[in-house]
Amino acid sequence: MKYFLSISFLLLIATDLYSDDHSEEQSFPGMVSSDVFDMGGGMEMHVERRKTCNQGTVPKHFHPAAGTLVYVLDGVSQSKSSGKWKKYSNNEYWFEKSDWVHGGETDAPDLGDVCSDLLVIRVAESG
């Protein structure tokens, strides 16, 4: 676990350094940076950093990936990935299984006036 967190931290720093001098059109609300790393063997790692306030839920979507890890760097977020809503805060994370359709839920709890800073990591086939 320490190894995974160390790699995640290094990727976060590398993403911040790389994205500081690149201006890209944001494709997702709150997207700060988005990078893709070639892992070899036909696989790639997608690393995104998102910052939002008072977002509520996101539009319905899914990720065609082997799975997605969402790590809360700061603030509060929530997920229903376990089957029921759960709040996550600083240094907590959740896993979203492959092709899990989520977002747009009408039963999402109101988190109130909160912000979140998230690191999203997913591994997918190249292309």
Each PLM stretch: what is its role?
Residues 55-68:
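A short beta-loop-beta micro-motif enriched in histidine and acidic residues
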Residues 65-83, 92:
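Glycine- and acidic-residue-biased ligand/ion/polar-headgroup-sensing regions
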Residues 78, 99-127:
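Ligand-binding loop in jelly-roll beta-barrel domains
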Residues 59-62, 83, 105-107:
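Surface-exposed patches in mature extracellular/periplasmic domains of secreted proteins
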Residues 3-6, 15-46, 87, 94-95, ...:
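A short, N-terminal "cap"/entry segment at the start of jelly-roll beta-barrel domains
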Residues 42, 47, 67, 116-118:
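Extracytoplasmic
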Residues 40-42, 52-53, 81-101:
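Short acidic-glycine-tyrosine-enriched beta hairpin
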